[in-house]
Every structure is written in structure tokens, then in C-alpha cells.
UniProtKB/Swiss-Prot annotation:
CDD domains: HATPase_GyrB-like, TopoII_Trans_DNA_gyrase, TOPRIM_TopoIIA_GyrB
GO cellular component: chromosome; cytoplasm
Main location: cytoplasm
Organism: Streptococcus pyogenes serotype M3 (strain ATCC BAA-595 / MGAS315)
GO BP annotations, alphabetical order: DNA topological change; DNA-templated DNA replication
Cofactor note: Binds two Mg(2+) per subunit. The magnesium ions form salt bridges with both the protein and the DNA. Can also accept other divalent metal cations, such as Mn(2+) or Ca(2+).
Name of the protein: DNA gyrase subunit B
Domain Toprim intervals: 429-543
């Protein structure tokens, strides 16, 4: 024991100043890039573009830039061009170096902290440019200012040569060109055009009148898009509702400024039952909402109730409409510009400034009250839609109680047809939603009972895109799923109570199976989205073919764009001598016995599963509404445009 203590003391004494590492300049960024850009995977790679684009957007917000161009160059590098004032090139007093060099080599340097350069800013703590420089093999900047073109180049964050004048110009602006470092971005350095284009379009919506374009110069991938919306977020709402039936044609739009905080709101009601509210602060999408959404929601509910009571659409003795009632079918975009935004969490997903609640509430209330008074016919339609939603909510109340559970892992109230697992470890547990009783039987027999649960469903579940809340909660299959998951429903939904952290959709490999899968994904997207966002949702990939020699299946072929090539290769492989392989086609899960289903589709060691994610909520919302909503024309157009990719089940 004494020897052990001596050894411990020796170890403690060895921890001294010589073991403290000091990272200078941008070394810290290269050492821990995830701290600055979130990850070094695809998301972090694209974050580099946003850091540079955000600087140009800041110039636009300040009123000095009107046109931004983004290029994916032929070598997969990025160029961002703006027509702003140009980054300062004079000497920065503290560093003794040109300001533009300081911006790209010193963390936390930028025009965003003093309060004079930019009234509002979307940049992350002002570190963006230097972080991009640190994580690029090469970066160069051209500044068009004071009649001269100034140029400087960097490699992995280090200065290659001093700032120099390389020509004359009669324009102003900044051009930044960079190449991501493959030593940092080991997963991929290939930019996704669609990811960049969607965000650039969003920025054009959020900055009314701004012209912003994206051009892809890569061989075989050449394309470009130009975005410019004089209607701003009003145009954004029209875009979101493009495939929906609207209650009134022109979105309600209001903007105002109070105490230095600018607020814009655009909204429009549709005939759907779903709510789509998107909020932004300084152009940053606040996925988790925040105080601007709180102010908007409170004002919307209060103003509609006041109008309904004053105009006798709601009687004095009738209950007020709830927020849930008045938001049914609503599409809204809220955008605030704040000189000192406070975001909760490192990823800026929730606005935390408490003063924004009352400012948003007041500005929107005044404008919305005016609109209702000036448009009585539209006002009545809005109130009547809320009243219908209220009646459906009351009818659904009893059904909702069925989905509530005392505890996430309590099994006393689980649906009778659920074959549950024995483990209480949600992190390990898997719930398979299986199409049909016969396949459900095979899955129950073939599963690992310790951590795999089976919930069979009969036929096609309800299309929630077209259904009222009372019908949704009256549906037995839907109730069974919510009860089995243990997450609750609606306002009671809590993803942390999920009894399984893998929710696997397992349907037949035919058109009916694809339809059931789509119905389930629609349900999950609309009413269990946190489960989707947590990465819990998967689609099983059962084999589509089995290659048999005699009575033995030698190889299974998984579905995919190369499935026919796989099949051809397998047939050639087993066509040896006199043996003639045959092909077994699996159209239904029930065509496999329990052992085959386990081996091919459920065994974690062998199976192939596709994880379902949502990269773009606005686009996903539009697609679900188009495919599953009431309007036939957009769906028919989509089918005609994509018919070449369709699967015929004949």
C-alpha cells in the first residue's frame, strides 16, 4: 500500500508546466476543427462556404452589397464574390499588419465586435474567415477598394506573401477563393451543389432584393441558378405553399423595427391540417425556435380570439381557441435582425433574447389586427378554420389519452399485438414495424428476443396528410405505434422516453410495400419528427432475389440501382459445370421463412439498413404535401417528370 502511494505521488509530481501545450495562431483550429465548424464530415465541409458567404451577407445587411456569387470551381474549390465595400486593407493597430491579413489569420478578428461596422451580423463570433483559412490547403483573397486590386495568399492558415497591389479597378468588393484541406476533411472534400443551392435560395428569400447566384463548373456537373426575391419572406411562404391549396391568395406580410430590433413576418393559411412555422435570427435558421416564435405565437392566438369574440364568431361563453387550433394549416416565416443575438447552444438553433418576445408580439399584433379589420372575409375564414380545428381537438382528446403512458419502459399498457423484447436498454432496443401478419409471424420467430421487438401492421395505415387529429388518434395502427414507442403524442411528445432507439420499417419489396413505407414516413415526419432528427428511423433492406443452386440459396441480392448487374454476376458465378442456378424473387416478406428473414434482414451482423434523415425541412415539407396531400395535379406532374425512375409492379 505504501509503495502504491509513492508511485501515485510520483505520477502527480510529473504533471508540471512542461506538459502544458500552447497552441499558437490557428494551430488550435487545425487540432480541434470540430469545435469551430461542428464536424469534419459533409456538414462541416459545407460550413466553410457559409462562413465566407455570411461575411458577404453581413455587407448586404449593412446596405453595402447587392450581389453575391458563389462558384464551385472545376477543381472543387470554392470562390465567393461580393460587391460590398471590400475588407479593409489599411494597417490594423493592434497587430501591425493589414486588416485583411488580420481577418484571415487571427481568431476573433473581424468587423463584428465593436458595434460600429455592422448593426447586425450572422457570423459565428467573428471567427469565420480565419477558421476557413486554417482548414484550407490554399486560400487567396482579392479586395477591390480605393481604385486598386489588393491580393494576398495563404496556405493552411499561414501567410505566403505580404499583401500586394496587382492592378486597378473601378468597382468595390471582395473575392475569396479556398480549397478545403483533405488532411482535415478525410471523409469527403466534394461539395454537394443541392445543399449549397438550397441554402443560397433561403438567403435570397431572407434578404429582400439581394441577388445571389451559384455556379457549378465541375466537368459533367455544370449548372447554375440565380435567386432574387423582391417579395422576401412573403415569396418564401408562397414557395413553401406552392403545391398546397391556400385559403387566401396573397400572404400576409408585416415588418417593423422597435428598440433597434427589426421583425418581419409572412404567413398564409392552407386547407391542410399541418403547421409549418420557420424562424430565423440574423439569417440563421433557428430550428428549435426561441423568443421570436414565442412572441409570434402568443400574438397570433390573442388577436384571432379577440377578433372572433368582438365580431360574434365566437360567443362570449365559448372557450377561446388554443394556439394549436389557430395554427392548423398555417405556413409562416419569422425573421428578426438583432444587433446582439443570444443563441442557446453552440449551434445557434434557439434564440434566447427575452426582449424579443414583447417586441415581436407588439409589432406583429398591430399589423395583424389591421389586416383582419381591413379584410373581414379572409378574417372569417381564418377564425372558422380555427373553430373546426378546435372541434377536432376536443374529439381527439379521449383518443390522445390512450397514447399516454405512465412510464416510457412500463409494459402494462402496451398493445396486444406487440411482441416486445426483454431488454430495458433503449439504446440497444429495436422496434420492427412489419407489414402483414404472416411476415410478422416470421419476424417474431426469427428475431433476437432480447433486443428486437415486432409490431405487425395490417394493410395501409391512415394517410395523416389528409386526416384530422381525431381520425388520426382513432386509428388503431397509429395508436399502437405511439404506445409501443412510449414517446407520447403532440404536446406530450418526449423523444427521451423512446423505448427503442432504432425504429425499423420493414415492408414488402413491391409497390404496396413502398406505399405503406411512405405512409409510415409521413406519420413519423409529421408527428414524431424528433425521432427522425435523432437518427432513430431506418428502412430495412430485405433481399429482392435469391440465387439458388439445387435447393440451397447461395447468394442474396439486395435492392439497388445495380441489382440487375449483381444478379447477372451471381448467375455467372454459380453457372459451373452442370449446375444451373435459378432465381427466386422475393416480392413479399412472407415468402421468406424465419431463418431467412433473420439472416438477410434482421441480423445486425449481416443486414443492410438505410437510415432516414432530414437535411432540408422546408423541402421535405413540400415533398410530403405534394405526394400525400389532396391536390392531384402536382402529384401527377411529379410522376410524369420522374416516370423513368418508377417501379412497375406487374
Amino acid at each position: 500500500m505504501i509503495e502504491e502511494n509513492k508511485h501515485f505521488e510520483k505520477k502527480m509530481q510529473e504533471y508540471d508546466a512542461s506538459q502544458i501545450q500552447v497552441l499558437e495562431g490557428l494551430e488550435a483550429v487545425r487540432m480541434r476543427p470540430g469545435m469551430y465548424i461542428g464536424s469534419t464530415a459533409k456538414e462541416g465541409l459545407h460550413h466553410l462556404v457559409w462562413e465566407i458567404v455570411d461575411n458577404s451577407i453581413d455587407e448586404a445587411l449593412a446596405g453595402f452589397a447587392s450581389h453575391i456569387k458563389v462558384f464551385i470551381e472545376a477543381d472543387n474549390s470554392i470562390t465567393v464574390v461580393d460587391d460590398g465595400r471590400g475588407i479593409p486593407v489599411d494597417i490594423q493597430v493592434k497587430t501591425g499588419r493589414p486588416a485583411v491579413e488580420t481577418v484571415f489569420t487571427v481568431l476573433h478578428a473581424g468587423g463584428k465586435f465593436g458595434g460600429g461596422s455592422y448593426k447586425v451580423s450572422g457570423g459565428l463570433h467573428g471567427v469565420g474567415s480565419s477558421v476557413v483559412n486554417a482548414l484550407s490547403t490554399q486560400l487567396d483573397v482579392r479586395v477591390y477598394k480605393n481604385g486598386q486590386i489588393h491580393y494576398q495568399e495563404f496556405k493552411r492558415g499561414a501567410v505566403v506573401a505580404d499583401l500586394e497591389v496587382i492592378g486597378t479597378t473601378d468597382v468595390t468588393g471582395t473575392t475569396v477563393h479556398f480549397t478545403p484541406d483533405p488532411e482535415i476533411f478525410t471523409e469527403t472534400t466534394q461539395f454537394d451543389y443541392s445543399v449549397l443551392a438550397k441554402r443560397i435560395q433561403e438567403l435570397a428569400f431572407l434578404n429582400r432584393g439581394l441577388k445571389i447566384s451559384i455556379t457549378d463548373k465541375r466537368s459533367g456537373m455544370e449548372q447554375e441558378e440565380h435567386f432574387h426575391y423582391e417579395g422576401g419572406i412573403g415569396s418564401y411562404v408562397e414557395f413553401l405553399n406552392d403545391k398546397k391549396d391556400v385559403i387566401f391568395e396573397t400572404p400576409i406580410y408585416t415588418d417593423g423595427e422597435l428598440e433597434g430590433i427589426a421583425v418581419e413576418v409572412a404567413m398564409q393559411y392552407t386547407t391542410s391540417y399541418q403547421e409549418t412555422v420557420m424562424s430565423f435570427a440574423n439569417n440563421i435558421h433557428t430550428h428549435e425556435g426561441g423568443t421570436h416564435e414565442q412572441g409570434f405565437r402568443a400574438a397570433l392566438t390573442r388577436v384571432i380570439n379577440d377578433y372572433a369574440k368582438k365580431n360574434k364568431i365566437l360567443k362570449e361563453n365559448e372557450d377561446n381557441l388554443t394556439g394549436e387550433d389557430v395554427r392548423e394549416g398555417l405556413t409562416a416565416v419569422i425573421s428578426v435582425k438583432h444587433p446582439n443575438p443570444q443563441f442557446e447552444g453552440q449551434t445557434k438553433t434557439k434564440l434566447g433574447n427575452s426582449e424579443v418576445v414583447k417586441i415581436t408580439n407588439r409589432l406583429f399584433s398591430e399589423a395583424f389586427q389591421r389586416f383582419l379589420l381591413e379584410n373581414p372575409q379572409v378574417a372569417r375564414k381564418i377564425v372558422e378554420k380555427g373553430i373546426l380545428a378546435s372541434k377536432a381537438r376536443i374529439a381527439a382528446k379521449r383518443a390522445r389519452e390512450v397514447t399516454r403512458k405512465k412510464s416510457g419502459l412500463e409494459i402494462s399498457n402496451l398493445p396486444g399485438k406487440l411482441a416486445d423484447c426483454s431488454s430495458n436498454d433503449a439504446n440497444q432496443n429495436e422496434l420492427f414495424i412489419v407489414e402483414g401478419d404472416s411476415a410478422g409471424g416470421s419476424a417474431k420467430s426469427g428475431r433476437n428476443r432480447e433486443f428486437q421487438a415486432i409490431l405487425p401492421i395490417r394493410g395501409k395505415i391512415l394517410n395523416v396528410e389528409k386526416a384530422t387529429m381525431d381520425k388520426i388518434l382513432a386509428n388503431e395502427e397509429i395508436r399502437s405505434l405511439f404506445t409501443a414507442m412510449g414517446t407520447g403524442f403532440g404536446a406530450d411528445f418526449d423523444v427521451s422516453k423512446a423505448r427503442y432507439q432504432k425504429l425499423v420499417i420493414m415492408t414488402d419489396a413491391d409497390v404496396d410495400g413502398a406505399h405503406i413505407r411512405t405512409l409510415l414516413l409521413t406519420l413519423i415526419y409529421r408527428f414524431m419528427r424528433p425521432v427522425l432528427e435523432a437518427g432513430y428511423v431506418y428502412i430495412a433492406q430485405p433481399p429482392i432475389y435469391g440465387v439458388k443452386v439445387g435447393s440451397e440459396i447461395k447468394e442474396y441480392i439486395q435492392p439497388g440501382i445495380d441489382q440487375e448487374d449483381q444478379l447477372k454476376t451471381a448467375l455467372e458465378k454459380y453457372s459451373i459445370g452442370r449446375s444451373k442456378p435459378t432465381v427466386q424473387r422475393y416480392k413479399g416478406l412472407g415468402e421468406m421463412d424465419d431463418h431467412q428473414l433473420w439472416e438477410t434482414t434482421m441480423d445486425p451482423e449481416n443486414r443492410l439498413m438505410a437510415r432516414v434523415t432530414v437535411d432540408d425541412a422546408a423541402e421535405a415539407d413540400k415533398v410530403f404535401d405534394m405526394l400525400m396531400g389532396d391536390r392531384v395535379e402536382p402529384r401527377r406532374d411529379f410522376i410524369e417528370e420522374n416516370a423513368v425512375y418508377s417501379t412497375l409492379d406487374i
